[in-house]
Amino acid sequence: MGLKKRVSFDWLLKIGIILVLAFLGLFGIIFGSYKLLNDSRLGVVFNGSTTTTVYFLNHKSKDANKELDPTQKKDGNGSGNNTEMITDVNGFLNNIEKSYANSLYAQGFSSVNITKNSHDTSAKELSDKGVFDSSWLVNDGLPSISVTFEQRREEARTRARKRQIDAQVKRNALSAIEHNYKLSLETTDGIVLFDSFDKEFIRNSLTAVVPQTTNTNSALTFEYKLSKNVITKESLHNDFLDFIKSKSLTDSDYNTGNGQKSVEGSGKWFKDKANGSAQNGNKTLVLWKDKEGAVQYVRNIFNVPKGGTDYLTFNEREKNLWDFLHAEGNFSSGDNLFLQKNNNGNSPITKASDITLKNIYYIYAAPTHFSQVATKDNNNKDAADVVAVANSADTRKLRSGDATGFSGLFSNYILAEIRTEDPVAKNGDPVKVNATLQSFLDSNNQRLEHGGNIKFQVANFVNNDGSYVPASYLEASRVKVLLSNGFPETATIAAANTKLVNAPLSNTLARDVSNFASSFIALGVIILLATIALGIRYKLLGLYKALALALSAISSLAFFSAVGGVVDVFSFVGIFFVVAVNIINLITLAELFLRNIKNNASIVESWKLCLKRSFFTMIETHICWLLSALVVIYLSNYQVQQLGTLMAVSAITSYFLNYGLGVILVWLFVSSHSGLEWRFFLYKKDAQALTKTSSNYSILTENNDIQTDFFISKNQHDFFGKKKWSLLFIWLTVLAFGVVMLGLYLGAPQLLGNFLAADIESSTGIMLGVGVISLLYLLYSLPRYGVAYGISYLIALILLAAGLFGAMYLANFIFRIDQSTIQLIIFVYLFWLFFQARIGQTTIWTYCYWFKRSLKDRVFVKNLFNDNVNSQWRLDLIGSSVLILLFIVYAAFNFGGINGTINLVIFYLIAIVALFSVFVNGLPLFSFGLINGWLSPYNYVQIHITLRHKKQMFKEVDQIEEQLISGINSF
């Protein structure tokens, strides 16, 4: 065994490359981990769920310019009726479902699940409480959407604090749900110039501008089609001003009064002339992104009783808003910016319905009045009050604009404010366009690409302190997603109600360690345990593989985060499956290497055969993985789409890093002189085969000789015995069950339970991703591996369907946990990926190793397949247990409830993974190789096989002789 040690350039080069790759791998692991732990786009990891039921009016307005108000009595059925029924309620709810699925992701929420009810009678309870007028009820019910999601939640150490946190979580959920994103350009008193439902608005023109290399700023652009056919660069602004004039704004605050005339005077919000005595209006337009949401948010703040649990959850800004609305605290004085009290000394706002779409802007700010001319003369007696408006912030004076001012809350609802005109030198002079309108309608940026004839640009967004800041690409993209996924035009929220679903999870390490950090630590522990196990079992080979495994896992998460993915519970569940698949692939290659060694192959030859027998199968597996992920990305929404993105990234990193880097490292070392030293790879008992010589063998003619002499290592189980044929009946029964379950899912999925993801499209995306790629692989396998293999795969796939849907049904029946935290349809996709990877592993271990050569030489198939099953059961056992062990480690770091209680969600997760593992790793995979043998075209029931008694020279390592060596198929 001894080898002469010598240093050569080849040795130095290969060892040097190994060290460089290992260093780069370690650097990638450390740097990737650092980036992840400091990433701002971290989602929530099992941190508590809320369910919010939103009730919608099943009426719509006949006039597109008039909104329905659920707090007011519905119009009667006479000629003055302005409402009509929504006929397709289910289609209406489907559109809202899709809107929530995408917009909540853009807001940063995790684990969203959505259910619909076309006639929810629980709406009557809210109507009886006066939340909305009962005249809107239809048969004592309304259509509703129930949305469950997770959000960040801090720890509560006292019972009182827990109540406050519960209230805060519920209120945050309500605020998030009651958004109705719609782009709307309006006057300050609510007259709509156009909105995103206008037929002339080019909806698909919403674009987040990619920053130039010399500038990091972005912008939001969109196109509109004015009635004028030709708009030139020179006439651009005047044409838009003509468009404004066509809207009949004579009595609007835009043209008349002091800028807020509509809310001033006796019995109104502000005292007369609180905004000055100018008479030319304010010439200000407001670009809203969610005006209805702003109204609902302010109404909710107003309705909270002072000193109650909800009030205690207010931040300083919200407390200031509450004080302003009730004319209390610092807002009780007679300041012109504050509300004027009525005769009883109370706020003029007496009920939430007083806050409307027409007056909501004036809670936010007092518009700067407009002066016709810029100098004081006989034509402009108020010219001394002229205020220069150089930017959007100058268009108004915030009601509360300090560091804790409530006006900053409106940054969630207002995009921009635009002053259209500047004062002229004297009456009669041409209109002078304000700088904010010039920015909004940039004459140098009128490249029209979507069918409009005018292009608007918002380069600065309202910040959370009320100031204006340049738009970042991330924020512009987020706003674009929100506006592109608004409610249908006919949607009006009547009411909403929120409840907590389950106690949130905390970590088990320390109070100051976040849920994400503890989950990431769990991932690190998993990789460490895998490294130790691989290193002990496979020595240097295992350490190389462990490095590739760690780099692949961290790179998958890091790249996923870099492309905009939110690292949350779905990401960790997905990455654990990726790690499990990669571990199985590594173990398969390592065991195949040892198998070749035991078969009298040299170390170099053994590794060559490993590559030869695994290369194309690995490509096939990862291509299926990647293509299915792309289908899911294209057809799904929200976190299911994100999971598809993670799987697509992982397919690439797993092949090139987990498989590719591991192969390169081992090959470089094996091909060096040091690699010829067996002690780096093998224990003494495994290395004994390196000194054995091939024995003389022959294939005898008698069946008894074949059974007694050829297969010296007796099979522990005979799966083809007469008594075992009863198993065929069981398999056929399960096969029929799989067909039935598939039929039920396609025809009546509600009978199987609530297995859908956040929305129907996502569930459809998963099923198409699984079904289409499985069919393509089946068609591919027929010419590559033969009909027997293809039929075996098809049967195993149907058995898998029985297992997956059966596991979903049992999990739903046994645990009945909230689907928001664990969506079972997600596990259908993940376990299909796991199944597909195991098919590849089985193909490497059996078909590529045994079938081709053995069947070619007409080996007795009965004994061959018995030996296959007996040789693979340990790999099957490892494959079945790896996932369960991974989630047990995950649970060890994430089982403690914030309030000192144990949350069972994480243990349900372990049980569900175990349940799915049994169904996926049991019958489908077990039967795959066995059925392949049954369907073999060779007659294995004949009594005698006639072959020549001669020694055959094979071009590669003999795959039959290994059965002469005791213990070759064990490890």
From Swiss-Prot:
GO terms for cellular component: plasma membrane. It is a multi-pass membrane protein. Keywords: Cell membrane, Membrane, Transmembrane, Transmembrane helix. Its main location: membrane. The chain crosses the membrane at residues 11-31, 516-536, 547-567, 569-589, 615-635, 651-671, 727-747, 763-783, 795-815, 817-837, 878-898, 900-920, 923-943. The keyword Repeat does not apply. It is found in: Cell membrane. The keyword RNA-binding does not apply. It comes from the Bacteria. NCBIfam families: MPN396. This is Uncharacterized protein MG277 homolog. The lineage of its organism: Bacteria, Bacillati, Mycoplasmatota, Mycoplasmoidales, Mycoplasmoidaceae.
